[in-house]
Curated annotation (Swiss-Prot):
Binding site for oxalate: 70
Source species, domain of life: Bacteria
UniProt name for this protein: Oxalate-binding protein
Any Gene Ontology biological process: oxalate metabolic process
Keywords: Manganese, Metal-binding
Summary of subunit composition and partner proteins: Homodimer.
Length: 121
């Protein structure tokens, strides 16, 4: 992609992948990569829509040299933020800075869906 050019990625072009026990978490997670690292000029390494069924989670992990943002689209759960458990729901934004650890768990009765973005420093 050249500087100044746009791009539209059609939903029909996106194939979600299923990951069991992501980062040591519980159950299965569905991840749909929306843009590649190259499309984001190597300034971000992830832009994805995540879906966690009830009881599923992304395990505790640490970010170094990057930060991660979650924007909660649907459902509810718990964001584990450096040892603190914070209830989350649709419309909330979760931020994890470089050097920090986090995980996310679906504690609700419906799917927890969110956008995940990892920006490189």
């Amino acid at each position: 992609m050249k500087e100044g050019t746009g791009m539209v990625v059609r939903s029909s072009e996106i194939t979600p992948e299923r990951i069991s026990n992501m980062r040591g978490g519980k159950g299965e997670v569905e991840m749909a990569h929306l843009l590649s690292k190259e499309a984001m000029h190597n300034k971000a390494r992830l832009f994805a829509r995540m879906k966690l069924p009830p009881g599923s989670s992304v395990g505790l992990h640490k970010h170094e040299g990057e930060f991660e943002i979650y924007y909660i689209l649907l459902g509810e759960g718990v964001f584990h933020d450096n040892g603190k458990d914070v209830p989350i729901k649709a419309g909330d934004v979760c931020f994890t800075d470089s050097g920090e650890s986090h995980s996310i768990e679906n504690t609700g009765n419906t799917d927890l869906e969110f956008l995940a973005v990892i920006i490189l420093l």
